[in-house]
Amino acid sequence: MQFIKYKSYILKFLLVSCIFCINGCDCTILCPNGLIAQEQRFVLFVSFFTMLLIIIPVIFMTIFFVLRYRESNFSKTYDPKWSHSNIIELLIWGIPIIIIVFLSIFSWKSVHDLDPKKPIVSNVQPIKINVISLDWKWLFIYPDQKIATINKLIIPINTPIIFNLTSGSVMNSFFIPSLGSQIYVMPGMKTNLNLIANKLGQFKGFSSNYSGKGFSNMKFDVLVTSDHIFFYEWVKKIQKSKYKLNSMYQFNQLAIPSDNNAIKYFSNLKENLFNVVIANVLKISL
């Protein structure tokens, strides 16, 4: 009987306690590690709190009107013939219009400022990385360094990264939440993405578009190094790798669908491999 008496309080306590359980969740998007992700978080916050300017007053007025004009409230004047108020009309039309205009201008500017193809202004020489999505793994090609990796991306801190992306299979989506923009990749097409990491650390990237049975394991590691010296020492090690990727036969073997792929490094790359993959899909020769 005692339990039944306090049942509602116990349930409320358990419900509120669930909030503290999310303390262990990863809040990647709200804790960015790159300039683009920081700007996107700012856009999210501005849009969210601007819309609260409408939502909060509406909730407040709903509660206020219910209490003030309830049937049992005899202290207020009953005026059934009331039908219009210039002040109310001004508020309920004017404020939403102002907010919509503000969000329109703000969104338009933000979309252009954060265009994935827009180069990042920096005094540091950018690094080019070609990305090919395969079933179910990511191939990262460093064309200037003549190396490639499977499911491993290493970049120096505060260095603009120019990604050229395509798919060697079905349509997919490339996303590193800590650094910013998600972008779709399609076979036979090339798209661009510019990112930069402003904090050291190891982050996760993944496919955010369903692409088959191995989709859930199509993830890769992103390591942000402290300087270019460490990066180029790593490059020299990979250039000595025993695994080669200097022919289309080797690429086609790599492209065979496989799940839960381990990190792998390649040296001695086929010249212009990225463009050849696109050309093969389009059935043209280079």
Curated annotation (Swiss-Prot):
Stored InterPro entries: CcO_II, CcO_II-like_C, COX_ARM, Cupredoxin, CuRO_UO_II, Cyt_c_oxidase_su2_TM_dom, Cyt_c_oxidase_su2_TM_sf, Cyt_o_ubiquinol_oxidase_su2
Covalent lipid sites (N-palmitoyl cysteine): C25
A GO cellular-component term linked to this record: plasma membrane
Location in the cell: Cell membrane
Spans through the membrane: 45-67, 86-108
Signal peptide start and end residues: 1-24
Cytoplasmic side: 68-85
PANTHER family the record matches: CYTOCHROME BO(3) UBIQUINOL OXIDASE SUBUNIT 2, CYTOCHROME C OXIDASE, SUBUNIT II
Record function comment: Cytochrome bo(3) ubiquinol terminal oxidase is the component of the aerobic respiratory chain of E.coli that predominates when cells are grown at high aeration. Has proton pump activity across the membrane in addition to electron transfer, pumping 2 protons/electron.
Protein name: Cytochrome bo(3) ubiquinol oxidase subunit 2
Gene of this entry: cyoA
